[in-house]
């Protein structure tokens, strides 16, 4: 049974502000990686699951720095490979460095002779002559949280250094100053965990299906939130990129479901407003992370069926850094859902024989 005071997931979530502070005291690894990657013409970022979500955020961060960057799933990178050019670079993201296709992706990159960087946790099994950037200590919980934020922090540091090396001083400064703001904003958000607990308790009490939706750099925040809810609480949850949600999935949303949009200042706001107004016609319960995208949608938030978890950050924070903030209430939600349902947020369900045996049928 998960207890929000003792679960590994809960402790990792609350350790994230200090972890980011500590990572920002160390720029050696990101600087070394940037010096190598600055010599490339294109960069692939590979990962699986939560690490793929980090890789996707990394793509947006590197693009902000002026890099031709592409996030790919490690499975696809290894088994359905795109041709690599000699001036390509590859970044492989992995929590523990032990996953089958993450290692195959790394091996392919090294064997191809391209510049390769690994981003992984301390004590990782990731090996090789390539540059390895460490993030945080290995997590107790199999529902990863702090290693995700750690990987995104490292990717943002690499992006900042790449921007500086290419003469994009404005972008480099925006990333560095933005990163410095994050720990304090994170702490303020985590101090409001009771707001999240209320949402979780209501969702469990009414058996709500959960639909998470994000766009741009937060296009993976929705799927990441859904993944955490499934891993921790074994609930029915789906995560969508905003436009994908509009093109079909929304017709399955019911009035008693919970829609969880992630909306920050950026190019997707007007389209998010369209989604929210459509959702208001259906009558689904809504818990928005961020800010209402328009005056018309702001009027919907009555504190009853429509709730808002606001994030107070400076107007000059790049949108590309917001996934480090928007994921926090979704991580808390996963742990509180587990508590309300009486599940083990940390075990990956290996404490149940059927699921433990299922896990023996394949190597991850």
Task: For every predicted segment, state its role.
Residues 4-42, 132-258, 268, 341-364:
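Active-site phosphate/pyrophosphate-binding segments
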Residues 20, 75, 319-320:
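Short N-terminal signal/transit or membrane-insertion segments
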Residues 27-29, 35-182, 215, 258, ...:
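Glycine-rich phosphate-binding loops that contact phosphosugars or nucleotide phosphates
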Residues 46, 214-217, 321, 325:
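Alpha-helical transmembrane segments of integral membrane proteins
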Residues 312-364:
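Peripheral docking tails and interdomain loops at the edges
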């Amino acid at each position: 049974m998960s207890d929000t005071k003792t679960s590994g997931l809960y402790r990792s979530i609350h350790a994230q502000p200090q972890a980011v502070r500590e990572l920002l005291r160390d720029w050696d690894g990101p600087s070394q990686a940037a010096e190598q990657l600055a010599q490339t013409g294109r960069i692939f970022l590979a990962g699986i699951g939560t690490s793929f979500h980090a890789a996707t955020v990394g793509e947006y961060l590197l693009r902000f720095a002026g890099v031709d960057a592409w996030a790919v799933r490690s499975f696809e990178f290894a088994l359905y490979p795109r041709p690599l050019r000699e001036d390509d670079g590859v970044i492989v993201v992995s929590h523990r460095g032990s996953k089958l296709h993450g290692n195959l992706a790394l091996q392919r990159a090294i064997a191809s002779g391209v510049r390769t960087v690994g981003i992984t946790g301390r004590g990782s099994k990731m090996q090789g002559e390539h540059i390895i950037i460490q993030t945080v200590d290995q997590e107790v919980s199999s529902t990863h949280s702090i290693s995700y934020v750690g990987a995104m922090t490292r990717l943002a540091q690499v992006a900042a250094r790449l921007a500086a090396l290419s003469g994009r001083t404005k972008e480099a400064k925006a990333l560095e100053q933005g990163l410095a703001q994050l720990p304090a904003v994170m702490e303020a958000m985590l101090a409001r965990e009771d707001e999240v607990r209320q949402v979780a308790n209501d969702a469990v009490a009414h058996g709500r299906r959960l639909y998470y939706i994000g766009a741009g750099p937060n296009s993976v925040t929705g799927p990441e939130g859904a993944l955490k809810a499934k891993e921790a609480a074994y609930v029915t949850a789906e995560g969508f990129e905003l436009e994908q949600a509009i093109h079909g999935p929304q017709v399955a949303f019911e009035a008693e479901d919970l829609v969880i949009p992630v909306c920050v200042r950026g190019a997707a706001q007007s389209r998010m407003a369209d989604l929210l107004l459509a959702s208001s016609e259906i009558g689904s319960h809504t818990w928005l992370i961020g800010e209402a995208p328009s005056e018309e949608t702001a009027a919907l938030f009555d504190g009853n069926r429509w709730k808002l978890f606001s994030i107070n950050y400076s107007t000059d924070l790049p949108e590309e850094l917001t996934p480090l903030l928007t994921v926090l209430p979704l991580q808390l939600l996963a742990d509180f859902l587990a508590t309300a349902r009486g599940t083990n947020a940390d075990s990956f369900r290996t404490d149940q024989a059927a699921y433990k045996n299922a896990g023996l049928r394949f190597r991850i």
